Amino acid sequence: MTTAPAPAAGVALAPGSATVEFRSLRRSFGATTALDGLDLTVRPGELLALLGPSGCGKTTALRILAGFEQHDSGEVLVDGRDITSIPAHKRDAGMVFQSYSLFPHLSALDNVAFGLRMRGAGKAERRKRALELLELVGLPHRAEHYPHQMSGGQQQRIALARALALQPRVLLLDEPLSALDAKVRLQLREEIRRLQQELGITTLFVTHDQEEALSMADRVAVLRAGRLEQCATPSELYGRPATAFVAEFVGTMSRIPCTRTADGVEVLGRRHAVDGEIPADGELQVLVRPENVSLTPAENGPALVVSASFLGAVTRLTVRLDDGTEVKADLPTEAVAALPAGSRAELTLPERPVLVDRRPA
């Protein structure tokens, strides 16, 4: 896939970025609650990813903002104005869907120009704007091609150009990469992010892919059962998750039994300080990430090497403690030869674990 060039001369960028606010937003479908009092603010010009498992409410929130779905209560504001009574076609938002949703009987150029045609723009203006946008997404040579003559990645870039044609102040992306193969998905991920930064357009990006959210977004909002668990930068979300759900949904975690001490917890006979709160009761576990676990060969060590998964520069080892707890550790691949399956190791944890949580029921 060709990487899109910088904006062509004359391409009009977004006419000012918008602030988007969800206030106490609720939506139910029968007995199922999709959104349970969502409060979230999207800053002007940022790309915010809505991340969470299926059914968490992320697409419902996007569709309510777009005007394709009604809400039960709460408000959706753009620059302080409640837009929930405004028809979808007047909301100044462009949307890109997972399924591309291109018109099969229209060429790439006519697909991009369709919204302009509906707005009453003249033929010359439509063609000029559509060609500028095709240049922007790197597909001017596909102007007269039809959707069936293009790859999935090319079709999605046409859909993106179409969404930008009316110069919306908010861009909505509903899992736009999930139908693409891995290589094209990675390329288009980088391209969307670059275009978003160049255009300065406020963007909401729905995804269930943690890597996609962390690599593209300025901030990530993690939803669970219609509620906001945490909204933070990717580094903060990964390194300082607010809840055990966030910690385990974003990246890999191991849970290791621990006991409470006066100033922290004790794990495998060693004391550790804890930054966050420690639950007052129940069986406790520390949560640690594989890259923060160290293993060294030790004939009588507490960890039995069970398996290894090659990941390139690192290899992920799974070790089992005497109580049956399994812990994952990422080691440089060249160091793994000293720790074959069946060998024992000494296990060292970070001075401060990511989180302390009650043992799940």
Model-found features: residue ranges?
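ABC ATPase nucleotide-binding domains
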Residues: L47, I86-F245
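Helix-to-loop junction immediately C-terminal to a conserved catalytic motif
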Residues: A66
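Conserved ABC transporter NBD signature motif
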Residues: G74-D82
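The feature captures the beta-strand-to-loop junction immediately N-terminal to the Walker
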Residues: L51-P53
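Non-catalytic connector elements of ABC transporters
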Residues: T2-A4, M253, D263-A361
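Conserved catalytic Walker-motif region of ABC-type ATPase nucleotide-binding domains
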Residues: P15, F22
